[in-house]
Swiss-Prot record:
Name this protein carries in UniProt: Aromatic dipeptide epimerase
GO biological process, one term: peptide metabolic process
UniProt entry keywords in alphabetical sequence: Isomerase, Magnesium, Metal-binding
EC number: 5.1.1.-
Similarity remark: Belongs to the mandelate racemase/muconate lactonizing enzyme family.
Names of the cofactor(s): Mg(2+)
Record-level Gene Ontology MF annotations: magnesium ion binding; racemase and epimerase activity; racemase and epimerase activity, acting on amino acids and derivatives
Residues annotated to bind substrate: T136, K161, V162, K163, K268, D320, L321, D322
Note: Part of a large, functionally divergent protein family. Protein modeling and substrate docking were used to predict the substrate specificity, prior to biochemical analysis.
Function: Has epimerase activity with a variety of hydrophobic dipeptides (in vitro). Enzyme activity is highest with L-Phe-L-Tyr, but is still relatively low, suggesting that L-Phe-L-Tyr is not the physiological substrate.
Amino acid sequence: MPTTIQAISAEAINLPLTEPFAIASGAQAVAANVLVKVQLADGTLGLGEAAPFPAVSGETQTGTSAAIERLQSHLLGADVRGWRKLAAMLDHAEHEAAAARCGLEMAMLDALTRHYHMPLHVFFGGVSKQLETDMTITAGDEVHAAASAKAILARGIKSIKVKTAGVDVAYDLARLRAIHQAAPTAPLIVDGNCGYDVERALAFCAACKAESIPMVLFEQPLPREDWAGMAQVTAQSGFAVAADESARSAHDVLRIAREGTASVINIKLMKAGVAEGLKMIAIAQAAGLGLMIGGMVESILAMSFSANLAAGNGGFDFIDLDTPLFIAEHPFIGGFAQTGGTLQLADVAGHGVNLA
């Protein structure tokens, strides 16, 4: 059978960043990711990327590589056309190794769509071939924040995402003021990365409203386990609230919809894998929740995969696929073409990323 999986390999790739990617819970200076290759019996090669982010998920490059090695036995000799059945087997075998499973699923789907000469965005629904991404200002002082905002606008990117720590509301507000003054037309997505409690989150939102700071989304202000607090902030803040760390599975999204924990779901494939991500999207859309597409610190490979999913499926209100802009060196060619904030997908087989 030409679509039988014949070979699988995993290779550590260490991608230097242009600046440390800092969030409230930690920072990275190098993206310690894993390149995954799946080869079919007809010679078709699919590429995937696993991007563990220890500060968020606890997963590491070493652990991810080991998980991929263990999972190979579930896939070798299997028909990639049954990828969702294979994804379920991977989830059952290594549920906690989400990045490893995601990298394998990406590589399988890239191989499948390359075999059939189909663009990945067509496979996911063909709704669109274009997205508009934001760019992130990582944690730092007011001077860094203002300079970063000006640099983002100079790139032609219109929306800005801001990482805040949540510990000192006055400090977070000072940074937002500096960003707003430097980029007065830019809508702001504020990512709290679980750093606030209810009192600080509501005080922060009240101040943003009083000062007319254009925050269009407040992402995961509270810790994952504070479901009641997230619901309170969603109900009382007056702003759209996104669940990121709180939305790691389809079950989580169902609970969010039932309990009013958030109004937007941030889909990051590295949190759950591709098959589970599609379930999360379906539940969110059925429940009337907004959608955001994001990622860990990923190269053009994984980001292009996510872009194909978001554009092909449609319905995503917030696009946060900017981490390739922070990667100084990588071994890839192809992927989405970026002009300003516009990401344009090509009509090529698979996700369009190849090894240089």
